[in-house]
């Protein structure tokens, strides 16, 4: 699937053992993501969404953010096979860089990435609010619809401007209105700033404030309504996972934008290397679709009970499913 002919322009280096090992390793990672990661992501993201929607009364604001990330994970899991089976650096590509299919697939990918980043940032800010001011109205699940509308509406509006640049760079010769919007790199720069820099700064700000609150010994720290330590561990693990897996993708977008914006011809060697690393960064980004729900499954203490209540409501023929069904026990174990 993968090729490392970007080492030089001859392609003879592909016979070297190091190149063969690299090709084999990346191909195995891609196949592992398709065979294991995609089904796990679809399964656990769907369970996360259904279990929380079924237990709306016990949902908290962190659960709302994880539901948004799970919906974005479902979209990414559905897109992963098409992206991973046809990167431009592979032997078999399903589309060209400027093709209609690429633009169509880029829309849900960008929206899902923005939703994941926004939800992570809001999760951090909400965690700080709950830590500093327990039982506040702002940290209430009462605002679920407004939060979901803000996250997805903001992601759609943000990606719309980037979509215009992508489309105009493809149909620039057919539409006069696109004459001044033929720069696809502007779309990448917009995504990097609004989709990564802003959420990263918000998350960093929330974590700094949260660390100050945790260091202060106040009477509120003995409040029975305070967040459990497991909630803080889940927050830290989620932030590290999301930004750790998405940072390479946005850094490559930024690097590609800087190189192309110079207006100088780029050597084929470096351009091929850039596309190769870009494909690898997307592989890491897609892996977030199944890593995040697994973190929620194993670090959220209320999820097993929610899943049990959901399974009890599922019909098995003319009777309800038994709570000790083998499949349920395997998921809960």
From Swiss-Prot:
GO terms for cellular component: plasma membrane. PROSITE patterns: G_PROTEIN_RECEP_F1_2. It comes from the Eukaryota. SUPFAM superfamilies: Family A G protein-coupled receptor-like. InterPro entries: GPCR_Rhodpsn, GPCR_Rhodpsn_7TM, GPER1-like, GPR146. G-protein coupled receptor required for the regulation of plasma cholesterol levels. Receptor for CHLSN, a gut derived hormone which mediates an inhibitory effect of intestinal cholesterol absorption on hepatic cholesterol synthesis. Cholesin-binding exerts an antagonistic effect by inhibiting PKA signaling and suppressing SREBF2-controlled cholesterol in the liver. This is G-protein coupled receptor 146. The lineage of its organism: Eukaryota, Metazoa, Chordata, Craniata, Vertebrata. The gene is GPR146.
């Amino acid at each position: 699937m993968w090729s490392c002919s970007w080492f030089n322009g001859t392609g003879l280096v592909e016979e070297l053992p190091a190149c063969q090992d690299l090709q084999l390793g990346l191909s195995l990672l891609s196949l592992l993501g398709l065979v294991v990661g995609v089904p796990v992501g679809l399964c656990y993201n769907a369970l996360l969404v259904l279990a929380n929607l079924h237990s709306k009364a016990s949902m908290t604001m962190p659960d709302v953010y994880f539901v948004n990330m799970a919906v974005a994970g479902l979209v990414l899991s559905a897109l992963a096979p098409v992206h991973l089976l046809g990167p431009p650096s592979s032997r078999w590509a399903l589309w060209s860089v400027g093709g209609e299919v690429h633009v169509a697939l880029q829309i849900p990918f960008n929206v899902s990435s923005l939703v994941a980043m926004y939800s992570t940032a809001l999760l951090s800010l909400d965690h700080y609010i709950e830590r500093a001011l327990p039982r506040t109205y702002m940290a209430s699940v009462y605002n679920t619809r407004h939060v979901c509308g803000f996250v997805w509406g903001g992601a759609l509006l943000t990606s719309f401007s980037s979509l215009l640049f992508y489309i105009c760079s493809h149909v620039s010769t057919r539409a006069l209105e696109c004459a001044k919007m033929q720069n696809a790199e502007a779309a990448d720069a917009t995504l990097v700033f609004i989709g990564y820099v802003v959420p990263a700064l918000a998350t960093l700000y929330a974590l700094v404030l949260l660390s100050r609150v945790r260091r202060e010994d106040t009477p509120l720290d003995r409040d029975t309504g305070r967040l459990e330590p497991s909630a803080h561990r889940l927050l830290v693990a989620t932030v590290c996972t999301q930004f750790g897996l998405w940072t390479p993708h946005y850094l490559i977008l930024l690097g590609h934008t800087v190189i192309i914006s110079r207006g100088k011809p780029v050597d084929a060697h470096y351009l091929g290397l850039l596309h190769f690393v870009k494909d690898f960064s997307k592989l890491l980004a897609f892996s977030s679709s199944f890593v995040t729900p697994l973190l929620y499954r194993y670090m959220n203490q209320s999820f097993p009970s929610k899943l049990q209540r959901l399974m009890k409501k599922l019909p098995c023929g003319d009777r309800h499913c038994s709570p000790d069904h083998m499949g349920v026990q395997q998921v809960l174990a």
